[in-house]
Amino acid sequence: MGDKTWLPFPVVLLAALLLPRAAGFTPSLDSDFTFTLPAGQKECFYQPMPLKASLEIEYQVLDGAGLDIDFHLASPEGKTLVFEQRKSDGVHTIETEVGDYMFCFDNTFSTISEKVIFFELILDNMGEQEQEQEDWKKYITGTDMLDMKLEDILESINSIKSRLSKSGHIQTLLRAFEARDRNIQESNFDRVNFWSMVNLVVMVVVSAIQVYMLKSLFEDKRKSRT
């Protein structure tokens, strides 16, 4: 589910020459989904997780009456970690264990309105990343200057990778906010048009009644005898 992280060519070449057996960087899991949950239904998802990883789950209700949903997050053992009712959005970060985590979106409380839901998963496996950094170091033991250079390169790569991941995360959230705001505006636009038409019809009917009543006041209802 994760995307591959590509390194600049000079860094890849340097690593190939100096560290022939070193492991590559492990990309973080960063996935987002948007789906429609019908009224009266519940949808659950399962995600396998490694040990001691950092999992962040963020969700938003983009469209639907009330913009609310019930959210449930459970551990591989079935223990409830998070349970929220009638929420429009939420962010949760947990340290994971080995196993499949379950998270559910529940719309059974609604009998009419379906909900459009966006959620994003971000997994940062810091344990494996630190181990890979140690694997890099053991191939350059005894070369202090080279060790310093490679550590600087590694630190720069991790910093750029973290910032790019954060930028992508923010852009995804901004798109979700924009979609929800657009849905709200379109809903308000439809309501304004509907009630404007109702007011127009009422005004026309009232005007017709007033004209009829005024006209009836000036009519001579007396019948002339022949």
Curated annotation (Swiss-Prot):
The chain crosses the membrane at residues 194-214. Its main location: endoplasmic reticulum. It comes from the Eukaryota. Residues 42-123 form the GOLD domain. One of its GO terms (cellular component) is COPII-coated ER to Golgi transport vesicle. A motif (Mediates export from ER) lies at residues 217-218. Potential role in vesicular protein trafficking, mainly in the early secretory pathway. Required for the maintenance of the Golgi apparatus; involved in protein exchange between Golgi stacks during assembly. Probably not required for COPI-vesicle-mediated retrograde transport. This is Transmembrane emp24 domain-containing protein 5. It comes from Bos taurus (Bovine). The gene is TMED5.
